[in-house]
UniProtKB/Swiss-Prot annotation:
Residues 43-53, 932-950 have a biased composition (Basic and acidic residues). One of its GO terms (molecular function) is lipid binding. Residues 1-84 form the SEC7 domain. Residues 1-12, 55-74, 167-182, 193-219, 914-931, 953-969 have a biased composition (Polar residues). The keyword Metal-binding does not apply. The gene is sec73. May play a role in protein transport. It comes from Schizosaccharomyces pombe (strain 972 / ATCC 24843) (Fission yeast). Residues 193-349 form the PH domain. GO terms for cellular component: cell division site; cell tip; cytosol. Residues 1-77, 103-149, 165-220, 249-301, 904-969 are annotated as: Disordered. This is Protein transport protein sec73.
């Protein structure tokens, strides 16, 4: 309680006023507040007395003074009294207030006019009625001066809070709201004050207040006693409370009445004591607030509006929203998704039909549709675990279309049309039926129906966890990802589901339509209801899911093809082309093989250096793609000379030397363009007995490029081990007839062929060489390329023994080759199965990610990044599978072809004469294989061979499949015309070197030439191979023998004897030449 000393003018013009003293009958404040009130009043009294004594001594304080202490500078400086500033935070109860305080709307009591004597700062007779909110007994004050000299502030009073934030001190009583005019201050006492009598009259003692107490006028000396003598009543445990429910306004017009009026001014409210109100007085009834319903999975629409108040969408849905009067009902009328339901299905049309023994799932569902709304059908069908009800539930779910829709959107659509049952087992049946239907509509998104069920159940639990207000600990995104660690699903998919589910709660159509109908009857409209803003449902109802989906297509069917080898006939053609390569001669200065021949006389250093043959399976000048870092999306092409060897692919930038090689190749092809491998054409051109010369001379000599090279250093070189060449049909920014080669280190090279036939030949040869090199098999070499064994230095009785040894070696190598092919085929089949499983997992993740429709920008970025990663992994796996399928197909054709050759060879051996001289050993004719081609193809078709090429693809090598030997060379168009006029036709006899003895003749190969194969490291030490002079490993020193005095060592080391098919890359260059020389003579 607070007191203020009025001025003398106020005492003369204003009358004495009374205020009611509402003594609380229950103690609601603690003893701490009582003690603090006494201490506060005593200190204020001492300060005022000290200040007034100073003013009195200076003569400025008299009885006629009109100075207001509250406005004096000294009082403000010493923080004695700040009524305006403190009224903003708490309420004061004073005797009187100035006009400026009343304009500030301070809830204070009326001023009391009294005179101040010169002898004392306080009058002897003062009426100080006090209006307080104390609910306990007031403490006894020490002196009346302490009451007049201080001003009590209601610390931590509930009046400091606005009406909307006030809470009852008793949690068992519901507080009601009141208008702003009802809040703020205490009520005036009834009846006007006596303005003539300065002393309080005894007539006011008989005035009865509304709450049953008397309005008393006492002197200041008796005020403390009266307050201390107030009765103390215990507060009832439930009903008593000091709250805003018991603050009532007082009518200003009728001051004699104690009936509250809502038209009272601010600062005139009365505080009642709730336990002591008489029965004849109407007690305000508190408004009962609606109790919060039980937490459910689908909240009310009001909750949705509060949750969506400050939430923004990624697209703001400007293109999807219509006018301000849009509602869900309008969208439903224009949507085909709700054609099976009626608007506002709020009540059952009749009772639920009973399930009889004669009812089937279809009949019971039809009866249920006639009596029960669609939204209530799902709880009825899931009520019991019955076979017919379960079938009817799945039949009801079958009417929903979930194709190519995200799982979270389908779940929202289902719950928008249907209600969930209350029990857990019933909810489980509904989720099971929903997951089964979604799995049927999207078969490639999940590995099983159980996986889909687990994900749907997790989304339902996540929604309940997030939007349940009673749950204090919400699940975080990382916790959801860790808990829902479903096998084979990417974590980005779980992150997407978390963001979309927590974006907005689920909505049911019945609740939405009822809310719309209710708001039509309301007198006010919420501004937030002008636009619904249900972003996921707007997407679903208007079928606009493609707006938020990432535009990335992951389809590889028919995209990568590797043409050229589709049957045994095409494989045979590629094999013949590779077995007759061109030759580049390299000069080896470290070896002088002629010095060790029988015809050389002189020092070894004076002998001519040796020459090493470097086989070239294919060559050409091809534009090579060079990617630039600065220019994105634009690739430049530069011409390079490309050489394809038996183990590597080489790139040269020296186009001058490249044009020289291409000119020699063109002249060679023009010279022998009319030659074939058939004996009839050979007989016509030569007129020679081919029976005697069939295996003595080559039918077509190899192409030997001149002059020999002293240096051979390519600009770029790649190993063909585990390489793969393919054509990308959908690749952008590439030229026509282009193909790509992927090497084992992951690097790629894109080349452009001049024609489509040339492109097919390049792809077929690269894949064939890569298959053999990866499996560790020898490259096929024509018999004309094998150096001929000279038996003139051996005795005649040793010829049969050497021929028998050679035949046994050939048979052993054929067995080892067949065993190696079979082992490699088994490895490829196992690898293809494993890689297919990994590819299926990536395809499921890619389909899930491409179906997602994120609602937030951050989620969309995550989905795009995840799609790019999955795309890169899937493309790499797909190319790896295509490469293994290509190798598997080549090896199977190779195995079948070897069986045909072995069978033909055995037939030739049976017809062979008893003499086993090397001149009578025959190799199987290629033409004889054509008789068994039909049987081999039939046998290979029975096997489950992976389909490598596109069915519509007719790519094949140039030639007749019926007679693959009819075409031996494929002419190259890309060749310079500068050298064509200088080449002259030579006679036929010069082809085989009968008359021409010049050493530079391309048709006369060197007698010291050695056929070698290029391995990974052959370019590092190529010249060392020139020391080998024969087809055997090496000639050992002849030692004395008891019989003949000669001995021949056919094996150079024990390693070759035990394992002649050791991995080639592990050999050094010295052992490489030995291995090839020992195994090349078949």
């Amino acid at each position: 309680m607070t007191f203020r000393i009025p001025s003398s003018q106020e005492s003369s013009n204003k009358s004495e006023k009374d205020t009611t003293v509402n003594s609380p009958n229950a103690s609601s404040f603690s003893s701490f507040f009582k003690k603090s009130s006494q201490t506060y009043l005593s200190k204020r009294s001492e300060k005022l007395n000290e200040h007034n004594s100073k003013l009195k001594s200076s003569g400025s304080f008299t009885s006629n003074s009109q100075t207001d202490l509250s406005n004096s500078p000294s009082s403000k400086k010493k923080n004695i009294f700040y009524p305006i500033a403190r009224a903003k935070h708490s309420f004061y109860f004073n005797h009187n207030w100035s006009s400026d305080l009343q304009q500030a709307n301070s809830p204070v009591a009326s001023y009391s006019s009294q005179s101040v004597s010169n002898d004392s700062n306080f009058p002897k007779d003062v009426t100080s009625p006090i209006s307080t909110d104390l609910s306990g007994s007031n403490p006894s004050l020490k002196s009346p001066s302490s009451i007049n000299s201080a001003k009590l502030r209601a610390s931590r009073s509930f009046f400091r809070f606005p009406k909307w934030s006030r809470k009852s001190w008793n949690p068992d009583v519901n507080s009601t709201t009141s208008s702003p005019s009802e809040v703020g201050s205490l009520d005036k006492a009834g009846g006007p004050l006596n303005q003539q009598n300065e002393n309080l009259s005894a007539e006011s003692d008989n005035t009865i207040l509304q709450n049953g107490t008397r309005k008393s006028s006492v002197k200041m000396s008796d005020l403390g006693k009266r307050i201390a003598s107030l009765p103390v009543v215990k507060r009832p445990p439930i009903q008593f409370s000091i709250s805003s429910d018991y603050i009532k306004p007082v009518d200003k017009s009728d001051q004699t009445s104690n009936v509250p009026s809502p038209s009272s001014s601010v600062g005139s409210l009365r505080l009642y004591r709730s336990p002591s109100i008489p029965n004849d007085v109407e007690q305000p009834q508190p408004q009962s607030s609606r109790s919060r319903p039980r937490s459910s999975t689908i909240p009310t629409q009001r909750t949705l509006e509060r949750l969506r108040e400050n939430r923004s969408s990624i697209f703001s849905f400007r293109t999807l929203r219509r006018d301000d009067d849009e509602c869900v009902a309008q969208t439903i009328e224009n949507s085909a998704l709700f054609s099976d339901i009626k608007p506002n299905p709020t009540k059952f049309l009749s009772s639920v039909p009973e399930l009889t023994a004669d009812d089937t799932a279809e009949s019971y569902l039809s009866k249920l549709r006639e009596t029960v709304p669609y939204s209530r059908m799902i709880p009825v069908l899931a009520e019991k675990d019955h076979v017919t009800l379960n079938k009817a539930l799945h039949l009801c779910m079958s009417g929903m279309e979930f194709e190519n829709r995200p799982l979270d959107f389908c779940l929202r659509l289902f719950l928008l049309k249907s209600h969930l049952p209350k029990e857990t087992q019933q909810i489980d049946r509904v989720i099971n039926a929903f997951s089964k239907r979604y799995f049927e509509c999207n078969p490639g998104m999940f590995s099983s129906q159980d996986q889909c069920y687990i994900l749907v159940f997790s989304l339902m639990m996540l929604h309940t966890d997030v939007f349940n207000s009673n749950n204090k600990h919400k699940m975080t995104k990382q916790e959801f990802i860790n808990l829902c660690d479903i096998d084979e699903l990417a974590p980005e998919i779980m992150e997407y589901y978390y963001d979309n589910i927590t974006f907005t709660p689920f909505v049911n159509l019945d609740d939405e339509l009822l809310l719309i109908e209710k708001e039509k009857n309301e007198k006010y409209n919420f501004t937030s209801r002008k636009r619904l803003g249900l972003s996921p449902y707007t997407f679903t109802l208007e079928n606009q899911l493609n707006i938020s989906r990432p535009e990335i297509s992951l389809s590889y069917d028919g995209k990568f093809i590797s043409p050229g080898i589709k049957d045994i006939a095409s494989l045979l053609n590629v094999r013949k082309l590779i077995s007759s390569p061109a030759i580049i001669q390299l000069v080896s200065k470290r070896s002088h093989p002629m010095a060790f021949s029988n015809h050389f006389i002189g020092l070894p250093d004076n002998a001519d250096p040796g020459l090493v043959d470097f086989s070239i399976s294919m060559l050409g000048i091809l534009p090579r793609c060079e990617k630039k870092r600065r220019s994105v999306g634009h690739n430049s092409y530069k011409e390079h000379l490309v050489l394809l060897t038996a183990s590597r692919i080489l790139f040269f930038r020296n186009l001058v030397w490249a044009k020289d090689l291409m000119a020699q190749k063109k002249a060679y092809e023009r010279r022998y363009k009319n030659f074939t491998t058939t004996s009839s054409s050979f007989d016509t051109l030569q007129g020679i007995d081919t029976e005697a010369m069939e295996y003595e001379f080559p039918k077509i000599p190899p192409l030997v490029f001149t002059p020999p090279l002293e240096e051979f250093s390519p600009d770029t070189s790649y190993s063909l081990v585990n390489a793969f060449a393919y054509c990308d049909r959908d690749k952008k920014n590439v030229r026509n007839c282009s193909f790509t080669v992927i090497f084992r280190d992951g690097s790629e090279e894109t080349l452009c062929a001049p024609t489509e036939e040339s492109m097919i030949e390049w792809v077929a040869k690269i894949n064939y060489i890569s298959t053999l090199r990866t499996a560790g098999l020898r490259m096929p070499v024509s018999d004309s390329y094998h150096p001929k064994r000279d038996f003139s230095c051996y005795p005649k009785y040793m010829e049969e023994e050497l021929a028998a040894i050679e035949a046994q070696m050939k048979q052993d190598m054929e067995i080892a080759r067949a065993r190696t092919i079979k082992t490699r085929i088994d490895q490829l089949e196992t690898s293809i199965t494993e890689f297919n499983k990994k590819l299926m997992v990536l395809q499921r993740n890619a389909k899930n990610l491409s179906t997602c429709a994120p609602l937030q920008p951050k989620t969309r970025v995550v989905i795009l990044q995840a799609l790019k990663k999955v795309d890169a992994k899937a493309q790499s796996l797909y190319l790896e599978i295509r490469k293994m399928e290509s190798q598997l197909q080549v090896l199977r054709f190779e195995s079948d072809l070897d069986k045909c050759i072995s069978l033909e060879s055995s037939n030739d051996i049976d017809d062979r004469p008893s003499s086993t001289s090397p001149s009578t050993l025959k190799n199987p004719s290629i033409n004889s294989i054509n008789r068994q081609t039909h049987d081999v193809e039939k046998e290979s078709s029975d096997r489950d061979v992976p389909h490598l090429l596109d069915p519509d693809n007719n790519f094949n090598l140039k030639g007749n499949p019926e007679n693959p030997s009819s075409t031996f060379f494929t002419p190259e168009i890309l060749s310079p015309k500068v050298y064509s006029d200088n080449v002259k036709d030579e006679p036929v006899e010069d082809i085989f070197g009968f008359e021409d003895t010049s050493e530079s003749s391309p048709g006369k190969p060197s007698q010291l030439r050695l056929q070698i194969e290029a391995f990974d490291d052959e370019l590092a030490d190529t010249a060392s191979l020139g020391s080998v002079t024969t087809c055997l490993d090496q000639w050992q020193t002849f030692s004395d023998d008891t019989d003949s005095g000669f001995a021949l060592n056919l094996y150079s080391s024990e390693d070759f004897r035990t394992d002649p098919y050791k991995e080639h890359d592990e050999f050094s260059m010295n052992s490489l030449s030995k291995w090839h020389s020992a195994t090349s003579d078949n």
